[in-house]
């Protein structure tokens, strides 16, 4: 999916910060028609939700059946080559699929390679402003600062969102800031207040 495609256009064309959901296909079916921007997965929930479907591929097919919105697929690998190979398997399934890759040296290299191909990407496990700056320069389109894990160790869950919003400002080519691991309505409120462009949460919090 091209960088200037569906997901990247949502912030400009939409009515405010976009809301993305996590959950199983059956859990999300009810909520997707209510203006939800897309579905976001991670490796933990993929393994959990895939069991009833028999495989991750079958699970992704089930997500694609319930929505025509983007489905963000987290991938992992021990090398840049493995990340690109795994990513290709999923992006060839549907134009709706967008890749999410953890922040790492291999991730930086994968983002740069995918940028040259016009493939839209999300960067997860972002815990510092310097990481956000580095992956932005590598070409990532969506940066996911983690909120609740910071709160659990006594920190400000949305500080990094504020810092990213200030750093990127109104730069035309800046990545979108997605508040991630948002487990309470209070944290969602703070993330919107502090400038996130997007937010992903479980359907139970959205409800």
Q: Can you describe what each PLM-predicted range is?
A:
Residues 2-10:
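Short, charged N-terminal beta->alpha structural module
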Residues 2-3, 15, 22-117, 147:
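Active-site beta->alpha loop and helix N-cap motifs at the rims of alpha/beta catalytic domains
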Residues 13, 64-65, 115, 136, ...:
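Anion (oxyanion) recognition and catalysis
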Residues 24, 168-207:
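C-terminal alpha-helical cap/extension of soluble enzyme domains
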Residues 38-39, 43-48, 125, 142-153, ...:
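Glycine-rich phosphate-binding active-site loops on the catalytic face of alpha/beta enzymes
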């Amino acid at each position: 999916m091209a960088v200037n495609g569906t997901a990247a256009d949502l912030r400009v064309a939409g009515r405010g910060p976009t809301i993305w959901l996590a959950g199983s296909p059956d859990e999300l079916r009810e909520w997707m028609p209510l203006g939800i921007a897309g579905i976001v997965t991670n490796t933990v929930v993929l393994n959990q939700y895939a069991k009833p479907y028999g495989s991750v591929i079958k699970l992704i097919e089930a997500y694609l059946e319930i929505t025509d919105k983007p489905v963000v697929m987290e991938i992992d690998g021990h090398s840049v080559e493995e990340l690109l190979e795994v990513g290709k398997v999923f992006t060839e399934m549907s134009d709706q699929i967008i890749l999410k890759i953890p922040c790492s040296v291999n991730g930086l290299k994968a983002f740069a390679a995918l940028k040259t191909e016009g493939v839209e990407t999300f960067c997860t496990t972002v815990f510092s402003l310097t990481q956000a700056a580095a992956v932005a320069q590598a070409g990532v389109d969506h940066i996911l600062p983690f909120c609740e894990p910071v709160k659990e160790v006594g920190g400000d869950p949305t500080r990094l969102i504020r810092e990213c919003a200030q750093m990127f400002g109104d730069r035309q080519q800046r990545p979108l800031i997605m508040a991630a691991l948002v487990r309470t309505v209070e944290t969602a409120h703070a993330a919107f207040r502090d400038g996130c462009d997007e937010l992903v949460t479980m359907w139970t919090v959205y409800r």
